């Protein structure tokens, strides 16, 4: 009599496929039809981090992908849960972060005939415009190859978000266990090196060597590449001033003598040759137009050929992965050495010193209530002594001022709103950074921005994560002194509840809360929060009149011809 065959099902197969591909963490929100999948993943040793909203779970997965070069995994239920996570998936794609969103879905036979199934939605086709790729699995024997494809697509070339649709009937479908194991694919070399054209590398070095005022701009693609040592060696060998975009801060420490960040406007307006390293010439750099010299020549190092010539002609495109491209640039530099003219470095230093003095005056001015400058000065003092922390930052004025004031000393320690300038990333990124690294995280939040994902403080407390949330509370979106134009006593469109005590939220979840009104109180609370490794909220009372409309990008608001 033969032994009885051992059977398995789709949800066990997908979990085994995740394990065999070294996926160790899932971020998500459970419900029909994925609850048992999450339970089984946890039973198999995969960490499951449960959120209060799928969007934050997706942001956590994306942050994990950025920090590790492995796809972060987000798990959602069907239809509404899928749509909640879709914003995070799109944001990952736009920013170039590897992420896979796995969602349960309804019965295809009913959905395709629009017969009104539970949470009916054609999720795969809804995801396609916003993801790097989207796949649906219709039979359990395809789960292994589907996950393998999702992993490879998410990390190869320019990284991005991939959607994987798992209908409930596929999760429940059965297979003989030994046969199922043969269908699982372990991905080998998912992101192979893409070497640049040697002629392009030679041309790039030749153009830089002739430049009188060269500048290197480091983008988050450079940070993602983890080519930190090659970038440092190249910049220091050629003595080329560099300008980091916000999430590239710390590749070289912001206090490095070649950093041109404090003379950003002058550097952009006067550089004659600019080398973009994993940075896109998009709205964050005024598309290379306003504020730039008309005759600036560009070298662009990017993994995506379609990015070249997107806004300004690129004199020398160097297409390849950043690590390989920088290795080639270093080798060529050693064969054809040059040093940036001292006069260019000196004039940048003069402008840096002038701007630093102006900033010092703002930072050292004592006010009551606090403003962004003196409050961020206190934060900067504490973080200077805690350089291992991860910094998450979102808001308008809170983001823009913190980016300029707070120095970063190590790569990939700053996570912010990125290419889309999206609000709501704060708690998800903070949780993702904490879970991935095990290090303390400080989230510097505008009060409006915090509101997008504030309920995730329960998640932070439930997992006892070392996250300190600093909320700059001026009682409004941008500012808290808006005017009611209706005359009906209604709040202004930009006003929030004045005198809100966000620190009190921690009473509900057994975290720690501080309400601070002075820089000394802020320094003490932040130092204590970091050192204690306890979930902490610091409510920083800011002048309602502090800040400007839309922060540093007021000019993006359409101009009115008439009206209020």
Curated annotation (Swiss-Prot):
Positions annotated to bind Mg(2+): 447, 474, 476
Residue numbers binding ADP: 158, 220, 280, 302, 322
Keyword 4Fe-4S appears in the UniProt entry: no
Residues holding substrate: 32, 118, 261-265, 355, 403-404, 550-552
Keywords for the protein's UniProt record, in alphabetical order: Decarboxylase, Lyase, Magnesium, Metal-binding, Nucleotide-binding, Thiamine pyrophosphate
Co-factor binding details: Binds 1 Mg(2+) ion per subunit. Binds 1 thiamine pyrophosphate per subunit.
Binding site for thiamine diphosphate: 372, 396-398, 421-423, 448-449, 478
EC number: 4.1.1.8
Residue ranges crossing the lipid bilayer per the database entry: none
Pathway recorded for this protein: Metabolic intermediate degradation; oxalate degradation; CO(2) and formate from oxalate: step 2/2
InterPro entries per the UniProt record, alphabetical: DHS-like_NAD/FAD-binding_dom, HACL1-like, Oxalyl-CoA_decarboxylase, THDP-binding, Thiamin_PyroP_enz_cen_dom, Thiamin_PyroP_enz_TPP-bd_dom, TPP_enzyme_TPP-bd
Cofactor field: Mg(2+); thiamine diphosphate
pH dependence: Optimum pH is between 5.5 and 7.
SUPFAM superfamilies on file: DHS-like NAD/FAD-binding domain, Thiamin diphosphate-binding fold (THDP-binding)
Induction: By the acid response regulator EvgA.
Regulation: Activated by ADP.
Catalyzed reaction equations: oxalyl-CoA + H(+) = formyl-CoA + CO2
GO molecular function: ADP binding; identical protein binding; magnesium ion binding; oxalyl-CoA decarboxylase activity; thiamine pyrophosphate binding
Recorded family membership: Belongs to the TPP enzyme family.
Role: Involved in the catabolism of oxalate and in the adapatation to low pH via the induction of the oxalate-dependent acid tolerance response (ATR). Catalyzes the decarboxylation of oxalyl-CoA to yield carbon dioxide and formyl-CoA.
Quaternary structure note: Homotetramer; dimer of dimers.
Name under which the protein is recorded: Oxalyl-CoA decarboxylase
The organism of origin for this protein: Escherichia coli (strain K12)
Gene this protein is translated from: oxc
């Amino acid at each position: 009599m033969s032994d009885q065959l051992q059977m398995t099902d789709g949800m066990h197969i997908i979990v085994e496929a995740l394990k065999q591909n070294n996926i160790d963490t899932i971020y998500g929100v459970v419900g029909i039809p994925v609850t048992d999948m999450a339970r089984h993943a946890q039973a198999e040793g995969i960490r499951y981090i449960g959120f209060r909203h799928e969007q934050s779970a997706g942001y956590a997965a994306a942050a994990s992908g950025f920090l590790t070069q492995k796809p972060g995994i987000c798990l959602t239920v069907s239809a509404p849960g899928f749509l909640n996570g879709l914003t995070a998936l799109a944001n990952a794609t736009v920013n170039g972060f590897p992420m896979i969103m796995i969602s349960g879905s309804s019965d295809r036979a009913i959905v395709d005939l629009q017969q009104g199934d539970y949470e009916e939605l054609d999720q795969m086709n809804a995801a396609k415009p916003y993801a790097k790729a989207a796949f649906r699995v219709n039979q359990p024997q395809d789960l292994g190859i589907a996950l393998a494809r999702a992993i490879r697509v998410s990390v190869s070339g320019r990284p991005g978000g991939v959607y994987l649709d798992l209908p409930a009937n596929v999760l429940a479908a059965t297979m003989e266990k030994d046969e199922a194991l043969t269908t699982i694919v372990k991905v080998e070399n998912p992101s192979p090196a893409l070497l640049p054209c040697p002629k392009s590398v030679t041309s790039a070095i030749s153009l830089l060597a002739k430049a009188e005022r060269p500048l290197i701009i480091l983008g988050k693609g450079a940070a993602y590449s983890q080519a930190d040592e090659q970038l440092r060696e190249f910049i220091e060998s050629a003595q080329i001033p560099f300008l980091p975009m916000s999430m590239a801060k710390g590749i070289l420490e912001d206090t490095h003598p070649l950093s041109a960040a404090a003379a950003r406007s002058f550097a952009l307006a006067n550089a004659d040759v600019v080398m973009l390293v994993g940075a896109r010439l998009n709205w964050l750099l005024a598309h290379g137009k306003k504020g730039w010299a008309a005759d600036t020549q560009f070298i662009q190092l990017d993994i995506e050929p379609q990015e070249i010539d997107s806004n300004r002609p690129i004199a020398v495109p160097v297409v390849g992965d950043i690590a390989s491209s920088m290795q080639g640039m270093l080798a060529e530099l050693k064969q054809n050495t040059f040093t940036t003219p001292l006069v260019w470095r000196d004039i940048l230093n003069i402008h840096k010193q002038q701007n630093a003095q102006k900033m010092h005056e703002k930072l050292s001015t004592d006010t009551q209530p606090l403003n962004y400058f003196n409050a961020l000065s206190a934060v900067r003092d504490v973080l200077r002594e805690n350089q291992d922390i991860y910094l998450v930052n979102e808001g308008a004025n809170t983001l823009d001022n913190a980016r300029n004031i707070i120095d970063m000393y190590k790569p990939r320690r700053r996570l912010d709103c990125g290419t889309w300038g999206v609000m709501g990333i704060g708690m998800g990124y903070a949780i993702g950074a904490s879970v991935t690294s095990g290090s303390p995280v400080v989230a510097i939040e505008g009060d409006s921005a915090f509101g997008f994902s504030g309920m995730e403080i329960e998640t932070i407390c439930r997992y006892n994560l070392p996250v300190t949330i600093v909320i700059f509370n001026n009682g409004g979106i941008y500012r808290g002194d808006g005017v009611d134009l209706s005359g009906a006593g209604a709040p202004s469109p930009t006003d929030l509840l004045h005198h809100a005590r966000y620190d009190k939220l921690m009473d509900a979840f057994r975290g720690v809360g501080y309400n601070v009104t002075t820089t000394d109180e802020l320094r003490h609370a932040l130092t204590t929060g970091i050192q204690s490794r306890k979930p902490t909220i610091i409510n920083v009372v800011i002048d309602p009149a502090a800040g400007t409309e839309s922060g540093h990008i007021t000019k993006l608001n359409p101009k009115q011809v008439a009206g209020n």
